[in-house]
């Protein structure tokens, strides 16, 4: 029940943990750093998977599965890549009762094991592009964990593609980060900033990393998806060449891109409240709960409730009736608010007599009456669409209110405690590191989209807030998960 949840104003971190556990989304596992994703949480992941998988296939990608274990010799082939992941790797040294001749790494990401296969599959330009996605689990040995946001084992998808030219690879990188942006905004109702990572924040082994960044209700940033231009690094490491139209041999060009179950954490922290989970209808497994008020003619009320649920289901709206009598309607209201059901429909004998019923929105808690007539399904669908759009609009307004521009370091240190800060940076790793050391804020994104850049004057030259040196552009700083 919602009374188990610490308020956001009292302790935001504890609120998040309380909500995840009270709504039965996930729980701590007996294995340190791992979590159990409970059915309510996994149902959200399945909705995310279904939408993303469809979007991947619409852009020409197919699914495959590669081994969990990666030979040490493969990992060592890409020096920058392994250097970036070495501290997080889990290593298998024994199997079958004896020490292994070669250590096996439990995948932290799959570039190396996948490129060992791509070398065998790619011979000619006719084999390109190769567009493969994998749904899998990965292991990164995290020291400080938080349910969904950072765990030792987590679920994700990772796309790995091979191309004949760098231009094609760059197009793929941008195509897929835009797929993620569309998913975040149209399904998660989560506004995101699309752009590039700084060199110190990019993926290990990448030429460039593009990302989408979202703001949580505490003003912190959360990286919601990444897409990497890997250049020819992995092709060279695995000697993956193809014969061109001109009969010459060239190394292929590579990309990788991925999102994970941390999106569930983002969904929770962006929209939920002190009563519990708030889900956008497009990611809610159950969109409408019908609660009969069982007074008077129970049979008639239940008959009407079942008919409404059937009509909604036929129209593609996920609806169900809670006709149990062991709990009061008030208890049910609170329970389904905790679970984040987007819309509640209350139906009693008086409602049936008057030809009207009460519907309550989860996002705003607003109650309205709608007619029990042949427009009911259309009315419910319109309300669900309104909820989806209103949740996005509310999150966008919040981000705008918590985004400030500063021109000096003193103002920066105050502003970065509350949200996103747009400021000039001199482009050096040294300045970036100093700011991170002193404030714990990092450069989240170098925005690329025209609308955002125009709104905040991102591409206007100026002076770095920290060093006082010339700056070619502004960037977005924030503390982050």
Curated annotation (Swiss-Prot):
Gene Ontology terms: cellular component: aminoacyl-tRNA synthetase multienzyme complex; cytoplasm
UniProt entry keywords in alphabetical sequence: Aminoacyl-tRNA synthetase, ATP-binding, Cytoplasm, Ligase, Nucleotide-binding, Protein biosynthesis
Pfam families in alphabetical order: HGTP_anticodon, ProRS-C_1, tRNA-synt_2b
Biological processes annotated in GO: prolyl-tRNA aminoacylation
Listed SMART domains: ProRS-C_1
A single GO molecular function term of this UniProt record: ATP binding
Disulfide bonds: none
Enzyme Commission designation: 6.1.1.15
Keyword Nucleotide-binding: yes
Reactions it catalyzes: tRNA(Pro) + L-proline + ATP = L-prolyl-tRNA(Pro) + AMP + diphosphate
InterPro entries reported in the protein's UniProt record: aa-tRNA-synt_IIb (IPR002314), aa-tRNA-synth_II (IPR006195), aa-tRNA-synth_II/BPL/LPL (IPR045864), Anticodon-bd (IPR004154), Anticodon-bd_dom_sf (IPR036621), Pro-tRNA-ligase_IIa (IPR002316), Pro-tRNA-ligase_IIa_arc-type (IPR004499), Pro-tRNA_ligase_II_C (IPR016061)
CDD domains, per the entry: ProRS_anticodon_zinc, ProRS_core_arch_euk
Enzyme class at the top of the EC tree: ligase
Subcellular location: Cytoplasm
Gene3D superfamilies recorded: Anticodon-binding domain, Bira Bifunctional Protein, Domain 2, C-terminal domain of ProRS
Chief location: cytoplasm
Subunit structure: Homodimer.
Family per similarity comment: Belongs to the class-II aminoacyl-tRNA synthetase family. ProS type 3 subfamily.
PANTHER family per record: BIFUNCTIONAL GLUTAMATE_PROLINE--TRNA LIGASE, PROLYL-TRNA SYNTHETASE
Biological function: Catalyzes the attachment of proline to tRNA(Pro) in a two-step reaction: proline is first activated by ATP to form Pro-AMP and then transferred to the acceptor end of tRNA(Pro).
HAMAP family xref list: Pro_tRNA_synth_type3
Description of its domains: Consists of three domains: the N-terminal catalytic domain, the anticodon-binding domain and the C-terminal extension.
Annotated protein name in UniProt: Proline--tRNA ligase
């Amino acid at each position: 029940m919602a009374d188990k949840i610490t308020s956001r104003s009292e302790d935001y971190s504890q609120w998040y943990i309380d909500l995840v556990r009270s709504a039965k989304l996930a729980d701590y596992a007996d294995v340190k750093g791992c979590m159990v994703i409970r059915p309510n949480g996994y149902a959200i992941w399945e909705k995310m998977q279904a939408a993303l998988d469809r979007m991947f296939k619409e852009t020409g990608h197919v699914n495959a599965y590669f081994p969990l274990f990666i030979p040490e010799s493969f990992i060592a082939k890409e020096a920058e890549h392994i250097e970036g992941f070495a501290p997080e790797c889990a290593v298998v040294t024994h199997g079958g009762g004896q020490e292994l001749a070669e250590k096996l790494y439990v995948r932290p990401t799959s570039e190396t094991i996948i490129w060992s296969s791509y070398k065998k599959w790619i011979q000619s330009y006719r084999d390109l592009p190769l567009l493969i996605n994998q749904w899998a689990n990965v292991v990164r040995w995290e020291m400080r964990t938080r349910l969904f946001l950072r765990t030792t084992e987590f679920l994700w998808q990772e796309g790995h593609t091979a191309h004949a030219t760098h231009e094609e690879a760059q197009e793929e990188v941008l195509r897929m980060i835009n797929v993620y942006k569309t998913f975040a905004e149209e399904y998660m109702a989560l506004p995101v900033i699309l752009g590039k990572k700084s060199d110190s924040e990019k993926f290990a082994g990448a030429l460039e990393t593009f990302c989408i960044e979202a703001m949580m209700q505490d003003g912190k940033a959360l990286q919601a998806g990444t897409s990497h231009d890997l250049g020819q690094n992995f092709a060279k490491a695995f000697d993956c060449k193809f014969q061109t139209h001109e009969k010459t041999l060239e190394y292929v060009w590579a990309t990788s891109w991925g999102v994970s179950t941390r999106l569930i954490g983002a969904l929770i922290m962006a929209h939920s409240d002190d009563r519990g989970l708030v889900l956008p209808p497009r990611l809610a497994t159950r969109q409408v709960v019908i609660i009969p008020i069982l007074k008077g003619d129970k049979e008639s009320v239940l008959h009407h409730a079942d008919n409404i649920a059937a009509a909604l289901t036929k129209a593609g709206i996920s609806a169900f009736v809670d006709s149990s009598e062991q709990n009061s309607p008030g208890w049910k209201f609170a329970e389904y608010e905790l679970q984040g059901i987007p819309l509640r429909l209350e139906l009693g004998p008086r409602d049936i007599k008057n030809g009207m019923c009460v519907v309550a929105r989860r996002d705003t808690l607003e109650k309205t009456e709608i007619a029990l007539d042949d427009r009911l399904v259309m009315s419910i669908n319109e309300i669900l669409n309104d909820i989806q759009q209103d949740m996005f609009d509310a999150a966008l307004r919040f981000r705008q209110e918590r985004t400030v521009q500063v021109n000096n370091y003193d103002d920066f240190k105050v502003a970065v405690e509350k949200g996103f800060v747009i400021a000039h940076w001199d482009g050096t790793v040294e300045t970036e590191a100093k700011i991170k050391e002193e404030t714990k804020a990092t450069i989240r994104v170098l925005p690329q989209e025209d609308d955002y850049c125009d709104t905040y004057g991102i591409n206007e030259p100026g002076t770095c807030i920290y060093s006082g040196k010339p700056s070619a552009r502004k960037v977005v700083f924030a503390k982050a998960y």
